[in-house]
Amino acid sequence: MSQLWVLYETYCQLFSLTNEEKVIVIGNQLEHHVTVSSFSFRNGYIQIEKKSDGSTLAVLQGGRQIGELKPRCSITIDVDGQQMTIAWSGEEQRKYVYYVGQQSEVLVSNDPQADIETTNARFSLRKHRGQWVVIPDDDAPLFLNGVQLSDAVSLRNGDVLLCPYMQFVFIEEDLLAVTSSEEVVSSLTETMPPLSEMKKKYPMYRRTPRMIYELPSDKVSISFPSQEGDGDPRGLWLMVLPPVMMLLVIGAVALIQPRGVFIMISIAMFATTIVTSTAQYMREKKARQMRKEKRRRIYTNYLEQKREELQALSEKQRNVLYYHFPSFEQMKSFVMQVNSRIWERTAESADFLHVRIGTADVPATYEVSVSMGDLANREIDDLLEQAQHIAKVYQTVKHVPLPIDVSHGAIGMVGKRSIVNGEIEQLVGQIAFFHSYHDVRFVAIFSEDDYKHWEWMKWLPHFQLPNSFAKGLIYNEQTRDQLLSSIYEMLRERALDEEKDKKRFSPHFVFIVADRSLIAEHVILEYLEEKNEDIGISVIFASETKESLTENVHTLVQYINEREGEIVIQHRKAAHIPFQLDEHSTEGNESFARMLRSLNHQKGMSNSIPEKVTFLEMMQTRRANELQIVQNWLSCQTSRSLAVPIGLKGRNDVVELNLHEKAHGPHGLVAGTTGSGKSELLQTYILSLAVHFHPHEVAFLIIDYKGGGMAQPFKNMPHLLGTITNIHGSKNFSARALASINSELKKRQRLFDRYEVNHINDYMELYKQGKAEQPLPHLFLIADEFAELKSEEPDFIRELVSAARIGRSLGVHLILATQKPRGVIDEQIWSNARFRISLKMQDVNDSKEILRNGDAAAITVPGRAYLQVGNNEVYELFQSAWSGAPYVEEGVEAEDEIHIVTDLGLVPVSNVATDRKRSRQKPKTEIEMVVEQIIETQKQLNIEKLPSPWLPPLPPRLARPASVTAEANAFPIGLKDEPELQSQSDYFYQWLEDGNIGIFGSAGYGKSTTMMTLLLSFAGAYNPAQLHYYIFDFGNSALLPLRQLPHTADYFRLDDEKKIEKFIKFMKEEMEQRKQRFMEKEVSTIKLYNALSEEKLPIIIVALDNFDVVKEEMPDFETQLIQYARDGQSLGIFFIMTATRVSGIRPPLMNNLKTKIVHYFIDSSEKFSLIGRTPYDVDPIPGRALIKKDNAALTQIYLPADGEDDIEVLENVKREMERLKEVYQHIPKPKPIPMLPPRLSMSVFTNTYVQHRASGFIPVGLDEQTVRPVAINMRTDPHCLIVGQSRKGKTNVVKVILESLLVQEPESIGLLDGIDRGLAGYANRDDITYIEAKERLAQWLNEADAVLQQREREYIQAVNENRATTLAWPPVVFVVDSLLRLQQETDSIMQGRIANMMKQYSHLGFHVFVAGNANEFVKGFDALTAELKQIRQAILVTKKSEQSLFALPFTRNEQEIEPGFGYFVVGGKDQKIQIPKVE
């Protein structure tokens, strides 16, 4: 590997050239190989290209060559006015290591006397106070870590000195490494750096057997010395005094009374006594002194032995404590040496998370006991005091490490902020040194102002959060919000674990809370400040005052000053243990952390297993197009083997999974916790099968219950037959999936029976020979997250396993994958799973569930897994291949991506690729490229993709297809789902055959929309002459738009009571008419009638939305509808109705609903009552329904029109109706139910309703039922009464009569107005004689009488000539607005004259119209009144019960007549009419 040197300004960059590198780019962007940010490169970036011969390098800028580089040569380039020098070593670099431990100076120059002779460098190295100092030469450039030196600088281990074509690095204080492209001549001793076993394996690190020294626990008993003997309590004088006294007495007696010999004897005796007593005393005194000295000597020797024994135990305890709890400064040194004590403690260690907080006098672990005896009965002498002193001294061990336990609960650290922060550094360093990042992780919460103090810790691997690149450093709101939530969820999951008391969670989290205010409002405090000792967390609270700490702190450490501290509380008890703080400095902290970060802790059998292997690496290729896919498809035969590689168990040792029934198969389990690589392993296996086997040999059906996206990369691959998913939460997931799978099994069984084979291998052999037409691949059913699937769909998993067991010979293989196997792998699943693959498991219990041992719980590397076949017939640990790796065709293999490392994780900067344009795009993954290659191979070989047994779930919205013609007699109303037939097709409503339709479902699930779809479909096929709609919209007006359809005869609302009554009458008449017509044609159905008759009858469809209202509020209407639904179908009258409850429709009507469309019911019993038990439920999706005719079919009803939302659908429905109106504009619309207008004026009445006026008929109003004009027939009934109370509209009736009379050009009209002169407007009319007085009335009567007499003569003559029927005269009319005024203004003679004229001239065109009160017509007995009573024609503007002129039927609770209405009475019969208003 040669090197490229780039020198500019005062900097130097070194780039190592590999054989794969073709083009090196020098620019100012991070993605460039060499980045020089201070240069603008306005003329283009510098490119260094290898020439084909490899002996020279071409230097280009902006695509133009500006020079060449030869080995050990350089070129200087002007870049935008700045100089840049590029040099190339041109040869492989060689490394030399020299021992310089005995040197005080090392000279590097071209001098033969120099320690290192070279022409490329000139500088010296001198040792000053144990540290090397580099002294550059002014004439020779020298760079330290890429920056040019101008003065002497102290060096540290690892600093790199650069000069042209050479590097100098102190790898140890006494070892100098020199890298050069030419041979180095040196007088120094060349050596190899001594490496410990750990350093040899660096950066791989594995724990070694731990040395554990036990603390002494001996029992040392110290016996007290024997009690010192009591001396003679009598002194010498007490012994001598008696005989002396006796001697003196005898002497005195002898002087007074001498006795001779007796006296002498007595004196001798007492003198002897004195002498012997004195001698005896002295001898005993000497013996006592000797015994005392012997006692002291013996006990002193005894104490010395005990002291030595206790001293040895004390030293042992001291050594053990200092060994197991070294200082943080010692640990820094250990780490640099890659000491075997790194990470020696495990979660099972007794001293797990025990840390040293300083030194103190601690109680001895050995026992010192003193035989106290009965001290109350003896004196304390110096020997006893010595024994007590020794026992006291050795009951404590002085100045040894004082540990505290931080393995559970919360501890508090109180003191000055700077002191506490420094001590936290030591605690963190100790924990990081002794505990692996597999076992312990840190989360520090501190103020952003202290970030510099905590920054070095981010390099510790323990601060990296599990399954993330983020650091456990929380110092502001952003880091808190982005990191703490995921940590909280992890703790919450642990807290909710029902077996948390029986397990140890890993990793153990140590929270360091130095700024509680940052998380004061966060929910994670419920775990940090409460007693949560069973979820694998510890908390260290740091504060300046103890009042800021939580009450659940079990240990409180107070720092008094920079040298002293005290354990105030320990294990929730007062302790007051003073201690001295350890001295430490921040120097070396970052190096310590970085060194630990570089170590890769391996656990278990992982020496030769790679940490990561991509799919293409496993396949031993770098390009997807180099995979031998075509050759594999042609050569690999499933009948022989299904073995495909899935990973490596060694560098070149491939692990294969073979699901052939004679090998590892046919079924198995895959388990792995979140982030373990389970889905990636399944994807690798699928991809490997697809690369090795033809799509007609192997196929997949992926069951991805929650739609996790595992199947997404394979969506277009020919091997993938479908993805069974329930991402929308369908109730029919399991039923549909099982139906699809069972249909596939039945299909295979049918083919086997047809070709008389019983195994898939035999069948495929027939297919390859051309004897069988359809290929049957091995079908792999892969169910991801089956634990959740089983918990929610237990019957499905049971049936799935059962189906797979049956399908063994049919070529069906089942792979179940889960995160949590505990409690979901029953005996049926276990007995059918021959192989099991377990990736990282959450705990030992989960591992035992899948492997029957706890090995998988110890896995730490993503993608690492155990393969177990049968009863450990195969048991291998391997690294599964990663198919999701970025695809790199050419380039530096180690530079897949460039990221900026932040505390929140990795932020990608760019993607490295040789193609500059591709580097700006998201790189494709290997799985994408391989799938593309598979698809391309399929196209090249023209391989047809096999049909899928699984059809996707029905979509939630489907637009109605284009209208079909009437001749089709079948209307698609929805998409029918039949997974048992592997089919999805239109559901057709057979015109006239499928009868009445009932649409049921809870509110809001598409009943009205379904009805609209049906009606629009029919309307598109049949014109308004062939099809009539009567729409009853009793719901939420959803059918209102259909009112505009040209087929809609009428539209009814709930409050249209009169119109509904008329509809009932209309339907009765229509049905009777149709029955009569059918009898005439001797047919029984509308289909036959229209086929035989020239006059076709239209189909009538009565659409009734919300039938529930009918039953509740319209019982009479319901009774009629039941009859119509029963009898109307054969007559061409059909009903479509909706209801929200089954009970809303009576059984007689329900039995006449041949087709039932059942939408979603909130109460599932409603569906059961309608159509019984069905294999599928209706999902709560608008438009989803079961259609029951003969069988129930799950269907998604089409929308009436296309549209993304309901508003767009409605707009398109309106457009469709406009289109239909234009199409059918020349066809008459069906007649609506006739209804009176809300207001009837005289002009509207005459222009709209009175279309033809016949002579002798006076239209006076509209019939309420038929809405046809009602007229007074003056030919049959020449006179008419207008009867009513005052102000009830009599005058208006008179006006209507006058207006109608005037149109007929009468001979004469005499008008007698009422008292209120309501007809005064007619006074000036030429053709009306307005009568104000009796005289004027008499005059008009005379004139009329003369005219009538002349007519009588003509009539008599005509009778004689037999032509009386041909006579016709214009009417002579006498109109009276008030009978009372007439009676008041005239006398009996005149009244009699009028009565006579009525009798004599009625047949000659004389007519009388009289208005008055009912009483006015009956109370009088004069001739006129009597004649008026004889009139049988009248218009009543009063209640029928309020008059007695006519015997008319009425009800007891007869309603008041509405203004503008009245009764037209003729011949004893009445009909209600609407009377026009004359303005």
Curated annotation (Swiss-Prot):
Q: Which annotated residues bind ATP 3?
A: 1287-1291, 1475
SMART domains noted in UniProt? AAA
Q: Where are the transmembrane segments?
A: 236-256, 260-280
- Which residues lie toward the Cytoplasmic compartment? 1-235, 281-1479
- Tell me the InterPro entries matching this sequence: AAA+_ATPase, Firmicutes_EssC_C, Firmicutes_EssC_N, FtsK/SpoIIIE/SftA, FtsK_dom, P-loop_NTPase
Residue ranges constituting the FtsK domain according to the UniProt record: 652-848, 984-1168, 1267-1444
Which chain positions lie within coiled-coil regions? 291-321
- What note about domains is in the entry? The cytoplasmic domain is a rigid structure with 4 domains (residues 480 to 599 form an unnamed domain) plus the 3 FtsK (ATPase) domains which are connected by short linkers.
Designated name of the protein: ESX secretion system protein EccC
Instruction: Say which species the protein is native to.
Output: Geobacillus thermodenitrificans (strain NG80-2)
What gene does this protein come from?
eccC
